[in-house]
Amino acid sequence: MADICPSRSEPTLSFTQGLILGQLSVVLLLAAFIKFFIFGDPPSPEVVASIRATDRRSRTLAHKKSILSLRETNALQLVQNPALNKKHVLRPGPPILTIGSILSKTYYKVDSHQPESLDWFNVLIAQTIAQFRSDAQHDDAILSSLSKALNGTARPDFLDEIKVTELSLGEDFPIFSNCRIIPVDEDGLSFGTGKAFDANMATREGARLQARMDVDLSDMITLAVETKLLLNYPKRLSAVLPVALAVSVVRFSGTLSISFIPSNPSNNEPAKMIFTFLDDYRLDFSIRSLLGSRSRLQDVPKIAQLVESRLHRWFDERCVEPRFQEIALPNMWPRKKNTRGGDETISDVERSMSKAKGVDIAKDVREEARKEIEAEAHGGADRVPDSLRYRHRPRADEEFPGAGSMPGSMPGSMP
């Protein structure tokens, strides 16, 4: 019987030893996670910038290849079915002002023209930004707009109200340089990269001129906020974790591309200006964080990486090629309602003065007018009035006393 039912082997570890071993494993995993994931040293900014630039460039090249392949497919369909090519029937010829004619009449040679420095443009932009910063110092509109944007409907439930604690618009100004004009097609692709420009290539519908300029900004533009992480499980407000975050833009350099799209009266579309940044830009942040109320964790590297990655993705999805921002331009033709200056300016000043001062200004003006009239009345008897209405034509005897006749009278005339 002992040979049929073998005896069970005794476990080498007791229950207590297994429990302790399991707890140690969990502690080691948590320690490794905290050390390498949360407090691990982030990669250098140069490495991160290189990786992001490579990803953006690969995305741009993939978009360009898809556009070129789509063009080849459409061209093949037009060759196989000429009836689809209605462009030549509806539009017998290119517009009068083509890209080639504009470049020739403005004496701009794409291949040989030297890039411009844009010093005058930098001065105008600096004045505009300085005025914007000055207005922000005396107005809370920008703070109100930021608070509404941060506490909008997209705020998750586990976040408390977000408060803006610091806002710095910087002290320096962006520098634009190396501006050049490049003809592009309707998809924003250059004509014949590496070849001499031919005006006949730019006669396609949608072709336009594109201004590209380098932008460089080294400043400290800071936005600091604070909020609380709310743990609503298993019951509401089970735990609260204060969080403070400050994000600063310290460096931006890239290539800005600006294009002008004419209006289309047939579709009732206004003229537009589009701008985008090429994929070779660099955007550096300085991110500071603070977690907790008593035992605080300061400048957690992983939080900085997550926030920076989210900001880069937000910027890429909005104004980095192939995406762009579009601005509708108003009608540039002079209109009466847009006229300023002259009599309207005087009337506007008078209305503003009446609103600001009201009865006090009118009273002072009447008092000054009364004093002037009284002074003229007292001194009127002692001086001869010079007004034209007090003058009279002099008689002959007053102008030439002692003469009986007008000088120069003919002999034999009546005295």
UniProtKB/Swiss-Prot annotation:
User: Where is there biased composition of kind Basic and acidic residues?
Assistant: 373-389
Domain SMP-LTD, by residue range, is 114-330
Q: Where in the cell is it found?
A: Endoplasmic reticulum membrane
- Write out the GO biological process terms: aminophospholipid transport; mitochondrial genome maintenance; mitochondrial outer membrane translocase complex assembly; mitochondrion-endoplasmic reticulum membrane tethering; protein insertion into mitochondrial outer membrane
Q: Which Pfam families match?
A: MMM1 (PF10296)
GO terms for MF: lipid binding; lipid transfer activity
The stretches that face the Lumenal side, renumbered to this chain, are 1-18
Sorted alphabetically, which keywords does the UniProt record give? Endoplasmic reticulum, Lipid transport, Lipid-binding, Membrane, Transmembrane, Transmembrane helix, Transport
Q: Compositional bias of type Low complexity: which residue ranges?
A: 404-415
Entry's free-text remark on domains: The SMP-LTD domain is a barrel-like domain that can bind various types of glycerophospholipids in its interior and mediate their transfer between two adjacent bilayers.
Q: Which family does it belong to?
A: Belongs to the MMM1 family.
Name of the protein: Maintenance of mitochondrial morphology protein 1
Origin species, per record, is Neurospora crassa (strain ATCC 24698 / 74-OR23-1A / CBS 708.71 / DSM 1257 / FGSC 987)
Name the gene for this chain.
mmm-1
